[in-house]
UniProtKB/Swiss-Prot annotation:
Binding site for [4Fe-4S] cluster 1: C12, C48, C82
Record's cofactor remark: Binds 2 [4Fe-4S] clusters. One cluster is coordinated with 3 cysteines and an exchangeable S-adenosyl-L-methionine.
Keywords associated with the record: 4Fe-4S, Cytoplasm, Iron, Iron-sulfur, Metal-binding, S-adenosyl-L-methionine, Transferase, tRNA processing
Name the record gives this protein: tRNA-2-methylthio-N(6)-dimethylallyladenosine synthase
Primary gene name: miaB
Origin superkingdom: Bacteria
Cofactor requirements of the protein: [4Fe-4S] cluster
Length: 441
């Protein structure tokens, strides 16, 4: 009898891409994917460990599976991805519901782990490699419009606060040819957009082909035909003029760059081991904006890192005002055991102070985003329709070239269509408009 498996994905776009790889591996073994955990013989959680609240969310979900296990005798539960790689066999003590665990480099081992689990044998596969990229596996895509292509895995940067080098291992890249082959398959299958992924995508290297990320992006843009091309995430110290010039010159490469800064204080950037100063970051921003007028810039910000003073916090606010990011992902610092910060620094900013500083960051960014989005009112945006709006089937939701979320009246258009939309109003996170009439403009 065919076993049914449900995979729930937490966290980043790389985890979503990994779930597509895992789905491909398991369907090749004869498993049937189901959406609902209540219908499954096997429940798998693909997990994120980047922040404490992400781990808490996963542990809470594991607690909720205890009731499902009572209702479905023989149910097998697996936890995969960054959380088990981070906590290792301690996961079995954290939750008695877990039957097996596997880290991000061990997904080829899943069929064996699962077979053993159905026989009552617990298992763990947690080896990190310097070679695994899964580049030979055709993902089982979850959508038909946009696709993720992981081009490299891991990170060598060792930022003081970050668990990624411990959960994802050292950097390694796919071959240029394997990436281009996947791009051409997507183009042939009618996909409209692709996103090149990496924990630090700018560090992509294929030494045999003599390719860095700028060359890869250029070659992908040529192979992609009319598909839009995006990429994430970039590290400020690695973004190059060559890369920015590709963004400027290639029409199908979207004018949106995510460039995490974390803090506006050079002192804090040094404590964080970020590898650049405030001035160097601002110089990169100036270089990008000079080459790509109208580019959308987004970032990550941490409030209350170890030793952060009020002056450091004010430096972050002033950098936000100077750069004027289109949007930002904002969090207060939480200690991640095993990181440099946990081992060598003191988490000395009180929780209430972290929350206050974070709220000031959020409030400032909300105002900036509201002004930037408001400036788009009256413009015409070329929008790739992705889905029906959650509020009404008469509306479609999509994204502009600059990664703005745009909601508009659908008329005769369908998801996957590229639509010219006249923007009539905005919020701090969304543009609202109507389809441009034929002959208008």
């Amino acid at each position: 009898m065919t076993k049914k498996v449900s995979i729930r994905t937490f966290g980043c776009q790389m985890n979503q891409a990994d779930t597509e790889i895992i789905s491909s591996l398991l369907t090749a073994e004869g498993y049937c994917l189901v959406a609902e955990e209540d219908d499954a013989d096997l429940v798998m959680l693909n997990t994120c460990a980047v922040r404490e609240n992400a781990v808490e969310k996963i542990m809470h979900h594991l607690d909720s599976l205890k009731g499902l296990r009572r209702r479905r005798r023989g149910l097998v539960v697996g936890v995969i991805g960054c959380v088990p790689q981070y906590y290792r066999e301690e996961m079995f003590q954290k939750s008695g519901v877990i039957d097996f665990i596997a880290g991000p480099d061990s997904y080829r081992k899943l069929p064996g782990l699962i077979r053993n689990a159905f026989q009552g044998i617990r298992g763990a596969e947690l080896f990190l490699t310097q070679s695994e990229t899964y580049g030979d596996i055709e993902p089982m895509r979850s959508g038909s419009i946009s696709a993720f292509i992981p081009v490299m895995r891991g990170c060598n940067n060792m930022c003081a606060f970050c668990v990624v080098p411990f959960t994802r291992g050292r950097e390694r890249s796919r071959s240029l040819q394997s990436v281009l082959d996947e791009v051409r398959r997507l183009e042939g299958q009618g996909y409209r957009e692709l996103t090149l992924l990496g924990q630090n995508v700018n560090s992509y290297r294929d030494d045999e082909a003599g390719a860095d990320f700028a060359l890869l992006l250029d070659e992908v843009s040529k192979a992609a035909g009319e598909m839009r091309v995006r990429f994430t995430t970039s590290h400020p110290k690695d973004i190059s003029e060559d890369l920015v010039n590709v963004v400027a010159q290639r029409e199908n490469v979207c004018n949106a760059i995510h460039l995490p800064v974390q803090s506006g204080s050079s002192r804090m950037l040094e404590v964080m081991h970020r590898g650049h100063t405030r001035r160097e970051y601002l110089d990169k921003i100036a270089m990008i904006r000079s080459a790509v007028p109208g580019v959308a810039l987004s970032t990550d910000l941490i409030a209350g890192f170890c030793g952060e003073t009020e002056e450091d916090h004010l430096q972050t606010l002033s950098l936000m005002e100077e750069v004027r990011f289109d949007y930002a992902y904002m969090f207060y610092y939480s200690v991640r055991p095993g990181t440099y910060a946990a081992r060598h620094l003191t988490d000395d900013v009180a929780l209430e102070e972290k929350k206050r500083r974070l709220q000031e960051i959020i409030d400032l960014q909300s105002g900036i985003s509201g002004e930037i989005f408001g400036n788009d009112v009256g413009s015409v945006q070329e929008v790739l329709a992705e889905s029906e709006s959650r509020r009404s089937s008469d509306m479609l939701m999509g994204r502009s070239d600059t990664n703005r979320v745009v909601v508009f009246d659908r008329q005769h258009y369908q998801p996957g269509d590229l639509v010219r939309v006249v923007i009539e109003s905005s919020t701090q996170a969304t543009l609202i408009g109507r389809c441009q009439d034929p002959g208008e403009g």
